[in-house]
Amino acid sequence: EAPKLPLVVVLDNVRSLHNVGSVFRTADAFRLSGVCLCGITGRPPMVEIHKTALGAEDSVDWEYFEDPLAAVEALRRRGYLIFAVEQVAGSRPLHQLRLSPDQKYALVLGNEVKGVTQSVVDASDAAVEIPQYGTKHSLNVSVSAGIVLWEFAKQLGFSYE
């Protein structure tokens, strides 16, 4: 089995079970170290998650935290840098990030309507956003996860070998 990337996704009160399943599937595709499910985010076993994840919820390590801030604090103690994926003052465009392959990273994705909890944004080491040029200025959570994870995986040395 190939080694896991030093990369974790934190789902902060994501309400759609299809989004949760899709993130599991993407986490499996990029060999992430794990997924943290927080607050109202659904957790396996659930039929709706399984349908979208196609079983990836069994191949990706995951843990549940009632409070997303507790997840961030636990990951920080484990040596992770925390990035909120959110459009906030001071957020950096994804394409401008330069990551170190020797560092562990956690990406926090927020609720479909409210985004990342403000206390989590405040506790994050940085915020990153996907530049957008349309009128909506928002993407589906699982689509955002795929875009950001691709860039992080590429910079952290994801290989097809």
Regions found by a protein language model. Name each.
Residues 1-161:
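Post-transcriptional modification and biogenesis factors for structured RNAs
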